Amino acid sequence: MAKEKYDRSKPHVNIGTIGHVDHGKTTLTAAITTVLARRLPSSVNQPKDYASIDAAPEERERGITINTAHVEYETATRHYAHIDAPGHADYVKNMITGAAQMDGAILVVASTDGPMPQTREHILLSRQVGVKHLIVFMNKVDLVDDEELLELVEMEIRDLLSEYDFPGDDLPVIQGSALKALEGDSKYEDIIMELMDTVDSYIPEPERDTDKPLLLPVEDVFSITGRGTVASGRIDRGTVRVNDEIEIVGIRDEIKKAVVTGVEMFRKQLDEGLAGDNVGVLLRGVQRDEIERGQVIAKPGSINPHTKFKGEVYILTKEEGGRHTPFFNNYRPQFYFRTTDVTGSIELPAGTEMVMPGDNVTIDVELIHPIAVEQGTTFSIREGGRTVGSGIVSEIEA
């Protein structure tokens, strides 16, 4: 039987569950799929039980092994892809590698415990990697008799969110019980539906990749006699059309401007190339030696070359093929951005002597050449072509 056609009529949003171990992330994921299957039956809304979500398959993303469960469901207005990372380490890796790009997340906090160390760490990571919209689900409220205690826990969560620059006073907090909803208690099922209504309204529809400013990482460059220089690569975001003015950014100190005189895909002329397309772009007024792999073609003014930034990184374990030993301040590996390696030095946070394989840490990086980067750009850390870490730019410094 043919697979059902993917329905594009509803907007698609990526979300996930985050929070401390055993606070009920996976139970909530199961409850959402199950309650939606009961209340809004459709071919997409199929109940998933705890065990099937918990037994997440291993995936490899940029050389790192991650367990992640992917489930899909739909509300009346939207289609969702939802990720749930079972272990804390999986969650950290997911965020840092960009394997799971979330438009928003549901922060699950057990009312019986209140915020715990991983609650804090996941909030910080969300801030660092650019997950801007969090909704709080206070779970296990059926186990707390004291109304004042629930109020205290809610205040504590809101304060913690404000501490990390989320709108702690204003963001939605829903109190419920994932387990009770899963078991079919209609009062708690109603709360799951309320949670989904909140997700529908509070997490904005993401901007589509084609609506963003053009970014095309250059993979290859060649010249066509009599026509000029062609740069090829996969369009990361945005669109490119004939007669567009573009900038060539990175590696070199100056930004070069040019005009697109042709766009080709599979040797055919196109009117425009879209995000995801592998294209060749013919550039007027650009010599073969004025553009190289590792640069990007971008909409003018949309991205700048930088050498200094803060990054949130995960360092691979020996078992993942990473280093066997720690590294120290001023470690100088290569940073692989999109299509090229650039050497850079690492400065560790004050008070951090060294970084062990398996750690995640915030670092300051200084590259020897400028690269087109912005907050949210992902990179790998490599040593002689071998990946030893993975990171994401959290702040531009120079």
UniProtKB/Swiss-Prot annotation:
GTP binds at residues 19-26, 84-88, 139-142. Its EC number is 3.6.5.3. The keyword NADP does not apply. Mg(2+) binds at residue 26. PROSITE patterns: G_TR_1, G_TR_2. GO terms for molecular function: GTP binding; GTPase activity; translation elongation factor activity. InterPro entries: EF-Tu_GTP-bd (IPR041709), EF-Tu_GTPase (IPR050055), EFTu-like_2 (IPR004161), EFTU_2 (IPR033720), G_TR_CS (IPR031157), P-loop_NTPase (IPR027417), Small_GTP-bd (IPR005225), T_Tr_GTP-bd_dom (IPR000795). Residues 177-179 are annotated as: G5. Residues 10-207 form the tr-type G domain. It is found in: Cytoplasm. CDD domains: EF_Tu, EFTU_II, EFTU_III. Keywords: Cytoplasm, Elongation factor, GTP-binding, Hydrolase, Magnesium, Metal-binding, Nucleotide-binding, Protein biosynthesis. Residues 139-142 are annotated as: G4. Monomer. Belongs to the TRAFAC class translation factor GTPase superfamily. Classic translation factor GTPase family. EF-Tu/EF-1A subfamily. GTP hydrolase that promotes the GTP-dependent binding of aminoacyl-tRNA to the A-site of ribosomes during protein biosynthesis. This is Elongation factor Tu. It comes from Streptococcus equi subsp. zooepidemicus (strain MGCS10565).
